[in-house]
Regions:
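A short, structured active-site edge motif that brings together acidic residues
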Residues: 78-91
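N-terminal binding-site loop/beta-alpha segment at the start of enzyme catalytic domains
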Residues: 1-79, 285
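Active-site groove signature of glycoside hydrolases
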Residues: 112-133
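Active-site mouth loops of central-metabolism enzymes
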Residues: 22-36, 91-102, 131-136
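A structural motif
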Residues: 50, 117-120, 156, 178
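Short, acidic/polar
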Residues: 31-45, 99-115, 165-170
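Acidic (Asp/Glu)-rich catalytic clusters
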Residues: 10, 69-80, 113-116, 173-175, ...
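Beta/alpha (TIM)-barrel catalytic core signal, keyed to glycine-rich beta->alpha loops juxtaposed to Asp/Glu
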Residues: 128-286
């Protein structure tokens, strides 16, 4: 297998994928400002080699999945679409947990309908506990069991997790085979270092989101200086660092701009020297 690919479920995917969240309107709510541009971005992503798209029917809600269907259906055999359940949107655009059996079942069927599929490639259980802004401890057995039952019914091929703790990952793996874990992780926030290494050992994908999220001004300045020295953007350096961090890391940077999409995809060709990696590794301690 190429170092630029990794197995997600039963398919080999390019490690630099695409996150569709920004295709919806402002605040990931409502329709995009320009639907034609959103469709163009998706088609360009595939033309640039993307075969792993991350989405959810609670983006919009419904909007992002409908745009994906309009842009890409019928889907290429090598395309893996990963979606999420476990949350819903309030009328005021708020993010709310949706963990009851009925809500989880409805979410799977909404994803199927709006994507135009009979079975979903990968469904991540998005866990919203505590304040909902980061992983918090609590059992996910009941919710994951509902998802596993839908897998047994043939509605879902593979199961993943999102916004989870190591304890929840261990709990989930006793209930179902887990093919990916999606958490916030970047150069500045490395709480999942041990988790990434453990998942890599077991051949499980790790999908970080917010590659530039939560940086302090000092951390941003260091990253910007490194990027300038390489003739690259901070986002390109952040993505390149993630690609070199571990072979099981799959990236899903999102954008609603073709120009930014092309910039992001160019990160795959950016090689970071040991000296640069050492500087970047120090950012989390600044």
């Amino acid at each position: 297998m190429s170092c630029n690919t990794f197995t997600l479920g039963t398919k080999s995917v390019n490690r630099l994928g695409y996150g569709a969240m920004q295709l919806a309107g402002p605040g990931v709510f409502g329709p995009p400002r320009d639907r034609h541009v959103a469709i163009t971005v998706l088609r360009e992503a595939l033309a640039l080699g993307v075969n792993h798209i991350d989405t959810s029917d609670f983006y919009g809600p419904h909007v992002t999945n409908q745009i994906i269907r309009e842009a890409l259906y019928p889907y290429s055999d090598d395309l893996t679409i990963v979606t999420k359940i476990g949350a819903r949107r309030g009328e005021d655009a708020s993010w709310l947990p949706a963990f009851s059996p009925a809500e989880l079942q409805k979410a799977v069927h909404d994803n199927l309908r709006n994507l135009g599929l009979d079975v979903l490639d990968v469904v991540n259980l998005r866990v919203m506990m505590g304040d909902g802004h980061g992983p918090a401890e609590g059992s996910i057995e009941a919710s994951l069991t509902v998802l596993a039952e839908m897998q047994q019914q043939g509605l879902v091929k593979h199961i993943g997790l999102s916004n989870v703790t190591p304890t929840q990952v261990a709990e989930a793996r006793k209930i179902a085979e887990i093919v990916c874990v999606q958490n916030e992780y970047n150069i500045a926030h490395r709480a999942d270092d041990a988790m990434i290494d453990a998942l890599a050992h077991d051949g499980i994908a790790y999908v970080p989101f917010f590659p530039l999220g939560g940086f302090t001004p000092l951390q941003s300045s260091t990253l910007s200086d490194v990027a300038a020295s390489l003739g690259a953007t901070p986002m390109q350096v952040a993505l390149a660092w993630l690609l070199q961090r571990s072979p099981n890391i799959l990236l899903i940077p999102g954008t609603s701009s073709v120009a930014h999409l092309r910039e992001n995809m160019a990160a795959e060709k950016l090689h970071l020297s040991e000296e640069v990696l050492s500087t970047l590794d120090g950012i989390s301690r600044e």
